[in-house]
Amino acid sequence: MSGRFLRRLITAAAATSLGASLAVAAPADSVAPAAPPTIALIEIEETPVERPNPLAWLFGSGQNPTLRDIVGLLNRAAADSSISGVVIRLREAPLSVTQAEELGRAIAHIRASGKKVHLFADSYATPELLLGAHADEIVLQAGGGASFPGLYMEEMFLADTLEWAGIKADLVQVGSYKGANEAMTRTSPSPEWDQNINALLDGLYANMRSRLKSGRKLDDAGLDEAMRRGWMADASTAQQVGIIDAAVDLPDLSAHLESAYSATDLNWVNIEPDQGDAADLDRSDPLSIFAELFQEPEIYPDRDTIAIVHIDGAIIDGESTQGGFFGEPGVGSTTIRQILEELENDDLVKGVIIRINSPGGSATASEIIWQGLRRVAERKPVWTSVGNMAASGGYYIAVGSSRIYANESSILGSIGVVGGKMSTAGLYDKLKIRSVGRARGPMAHLLESSTPWTETERDLVRVKMKETYDLFASRVSAGRPGMDLATTAEGRLFTGAAAVD
């Protein structure tokens, strides 16, 4: 079925209604019929992103809507007094749990304005059901399904595999609960890492259960039954266990809602995001393409404004990268520091929001960004908003702001350091590679790949990493005074809900 079928259905319904009104002239003394309820349609056609992709034009496509775009659409619906209800249609738009939580707050805002909200999708997984728990009604496409098994996480430990390949992960961690290196150095999790991850999953699971129990009016027994029977449910089973409200074929959705609003007709309106100007680019002109590729983004406001700076991806030294065709994007310390300097000195910028969605990365890059953030904070307010994650270096940056706001399901913390090298001497032997190293200077050989560290060398590395850890911890103490590092540092992870406590 075409993705714009519902829009055509809306247009056809409006035309039919107009034709009927023109065909019959009402008597002069008759009372005009009440206007039909207005229903706003908001379609989320792909997974929202944190920030626009500057390379989208290269593939002939518009921008994916950002999460902020979608929240803006929902807020527009909430503010429009002519709207009686909102239909949110998810079209091949899998969400993260945190995205569902942020969009859910915007849905709650719509409902608080006195409007009903209906969620429609061809199928539902756990995050989409969590989003639906904020709505008045969850509608499933007839013949569709829902999957609600709970939470599951699987880790792979590669120490034996690396040994078989002749590779030794020579890694050092500072922080008993850090554990980011254990996949390479162990065959099973350490007790500390196991405790860390289990506590995180317990928190996420508790948040999930609380939201579903509240939104779907289920008690503990009912929720357990929904997971037992609804782990892979057809529409009938999903409705029986209470994780959806109705199963409706898309062409019948308007009639279904007419019943819900006690109306014989509905006035449909579309609320759509700006898809960007990718279509305006002349792809037949190589000069136009290269000019667009290397064009600097405009960041200079012409009126008083609050600036938003995205830390989205791994934190790296130097310039930010978009990731190209195969790589992952990286947030560069040089790029972000330059942006922060411009915001610091721009009198029209009255405050700065740092939006973080990052697992961390380079400690040096994180420190450089932290320093730039503190310089801004000395002159104007700085707040941090956390998306899915602000862990390790991401949290390092966050503590440079005055306040940190996170979702209940956001992941924060991981105050610790991991580093080292991969020693490939055994692999070289298997492949009959002969490596010859030539060093100048007493410590130059420390980073060679052909030999592991001695205990003395490893101790030297550990001392330098401990210095990095101590600096990280001092930044946390300065930014979060009163925080007990004995119970929060050492690499521990927290949900947003637990981090507030």
Q: Model regions: which residues?
A:
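Bacterial N-terminal signal peptides
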Residues: 11-21
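Amphipathic alpha-helical substructures
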Residues: 220-241, 246, 482-501
